[in-house]
Amino acid sequence: MIKKVLDIKLNVKPVFIMFAHKYYFEGPCRMTGGEALQPGFDSIVNGAIFNGTMEGINFSMPDCVNVMEPVFMEPTCDWDIKDEYFDKIFEDEPEVDVYLASGAFGADQIYNEFAQRCKKTIMIMPDIWGPARAGYFYNTGVDVICEPTWPDLARHMVVLRARKAIREANILLVTRFNYDLPVAGATDSFVNLKDVTNKMGVHFRTVNAHEIVDQFHPLTEEGNHTTPGRVTPNITEEEIAELEKVADELFAGAQDVEIEKDMMVNSLIAHKVIQKNMDLYDCSGCVIPCPDICSTRRMNKEKFTFCLNHSLNLEQGIPSACEYDVAAAVTMLAEIAISGKAPYMGNTLPIMATDPRGVNLQLLHMVSEEEYEKVKDMDNLYVVYHSTPHRKFKGINEPDGSYAIRHFAYDQKFGAVMRHDFNEDKGQEITLARFSGDLKRMMIAKGTIVQSVGYDQNNCNGGFIFRVEDQQKMYREQWRSGLHMPLVFGDYTQELKMLAESYGMEAILV
């Protein structure tokens, strides 16, 4: 089964450890008078607090949270501590991700012992007394989170869901030569994937690239060339017929089409085979080494690329990275979980003043002079481009955006690629991020879309120019992080910062 990030829920169990006085008396532990001192009054107040708070919890929790059955207990001024209290709290602990706890003055011993026994994250329900509750937890090594307001807490819940989604993810690695890094492409990615698993929990499932390409044709009785006699998830004749219809639908919705249908179907077959392998290995994303596979000449023979596969995966909330960029794929996991939007990954490069027009010479093949003439202020510009735009920049569950379909190969015109006119999004704020290859930091940046580029071009050229606050600062940080900076529409810098710091990484904001 394909495990989609947005299907992951954070299981949150509210715990109310209240307190009730059994007798009438006054003194330094009673801060009221009149009827409030009478036995039974505390229980009335505690019940009202419980009902009102639960109503607030159900209202304020983000969609990614599953609120579990709450626990309510009311120890007394006998200072009673009973095992049954903890049995009740922890009866469904294996399913719990986070305990959302509230403790009344007087119930401190039970509240603190609950924390000592707990093996999961505890979030303190927001109120001004939070530090009094959280201080003991923190000082004794409990994984505790204390936020001042409910919106702050809800945002932190989103970050915790992202951690869970990453921890439970399996990423399909289509390999040719190496496991950790490609021969060509994203050699600035994670240096050691075992370290990634140890730190973040995500696991990896490998499939040989030649086996994948063999599966682009229906399985024969003899099996595939690379796996003779074995049953493999090859494309079927029925699936090819369905993909013919998918091609027609994609053509009908596109603003512009510049690829023949048979070439389009070839790329859809590649996508279908990747998804069948992801389904087989319970994966949440995939990474493919396009240069490493390209040199086999099998893409040239079969007339396809994996570009459309990445676009269609991303639209479904499935991280999908080219150039075997595992760091980008894991970053995408985080961005999807936090934003609910489909990321876009591309070459992320500064536009330096290297000639009178301020155009990087190495970008002239992609960014036309006409496009640059539309950019009046040349300060602090970056450009991002690749062949994997899509229709879900505004949200995975939002209506499709506009798009065009072109081809990758200039001469033979194979390899379907999507295009999006980012001029429709001028002024849109974006968040870019990337985990560093040594797992020591996460670079997080903001920008604003200025001008679309490459919309009318083929090959690996679709993207946009954007403006950052300080180009030099961004570049000086980027060289420690890597080329591809997966991005999403909107400002999610604080959530990504919280996520990085939760892993003990340095969060670099530029």
Where does each model-flagged region fall?
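N-terminal basic/disordered segments at the start of proteins
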Residues: 1-56
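Extended hydrophobic packing segments that form well-structured cores
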Residues: 12, 392-510
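Short hydrophobic segments within beta-strands
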Residues: 15-19, 124, 172-174
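Cofactor- and metal-binding active-site motifs of prokaryotic enzymes
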Residues: 72-167, 178-180, 184-189, 359
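Short Gly/Thr/Asp-enriched flexible loops that form oxyanion-binding sites at enzyme active sites
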Residues: 107-118, 295-310, 462
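Conserved, well-structured core segments that form the ligand-binding/active-site neighborhood
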Residues: 129-342
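Long, charge-rich C-terminal accessory regions
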Residues: 320-326, 330-447
